[in-house]
């Protein structure tokens, strides 16, 4: 209930205000992407972004709200960002951190601009630590029960982070789970360490889910166009 109230509150404070008050006064195009209290404002022109940043602070102060300084910054993002970054002496444009993803400027095989997305480093570390902690708690279970629980965790991770361009981060999680699982099986084996050949036979009988992209570039592009 409290979450619904907060959502309705921010819909009034932010969403309606941005659409009805801010956008009509801008020189170029703009949009907002928000999930609960995390949001990104996108502007065609830097001058609009600066004006909106000042107006946003005033708007929030009316409701005794403030922006988190560590999570708030103005970033140039888009097809001209690489060119402008090199002129300022930077190797690459700045990145955006949003909902557990690092968003960065990149190019496709044809050289056209594309938004790249990968798991944020801090989120990846936390995910690996959480997986390792949960695996310690299941070491007394049968191998089949362990496999079912591990696949349940992997399925949830892939479903959220399985987005185009993020396959390497998914593979890292998969390799880490395999490593922790073999280590866990070795710690409870009276014969000692489970060698890789033994572990391969275990995986053949009790396979772990392979990394999967639930949102490939083609579907991601269609959503962006909508």
Tell what function each PLM region has.
Residues 1-226:
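Non-catalytic terminal/accessory segments
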């Amino acid at each position: 209930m409290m979450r619904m109230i907060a959502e309705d509150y921010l819909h009034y404070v932010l969403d309606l205000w941005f659409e009805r008050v801010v956008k009509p006064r801008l020189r170029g195009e703009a949009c907002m992407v928000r999930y609960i209290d995390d949001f990104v404002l996108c502007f065609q022109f830097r001058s609009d972004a600066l004006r909106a940043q000042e107006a946003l602070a005033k708007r929030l102060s009316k409701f005794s709200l403030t922006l988190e300084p560590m999570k708030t910054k103005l970033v140039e993002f888009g097809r001209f960002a690489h060119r402008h970054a090199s002129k300022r002496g930077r190797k690459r444009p700045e990145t955006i951190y949003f909902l557990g993803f690092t968003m960065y400027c990149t190019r496709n095989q044809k050289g056209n601009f594309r938004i790249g997305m990968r798991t944020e480093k801090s989120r990846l570390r936390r995910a690996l630590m959480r997986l390792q902690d949960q695996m310690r708690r299941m070491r007394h279970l049968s191998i089949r029960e362990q496999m079912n629980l591990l696949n349940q965790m992997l399925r949830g991770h892939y479903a959220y982070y399985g987005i185009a361009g993020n396959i390497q981060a998914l593979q890292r999680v998969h390799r880490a789970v395999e490593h922790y699982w073999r280590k866990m099986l070795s710690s409870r084996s009276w014969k000692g360490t489970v060698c890789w050949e033994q572990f391969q036979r275990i995986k053949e009988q009790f396979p772990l889910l392979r990394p999967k992209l639930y949102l490939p570039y083609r579907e991601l592009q269609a959503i962006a166009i909508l």
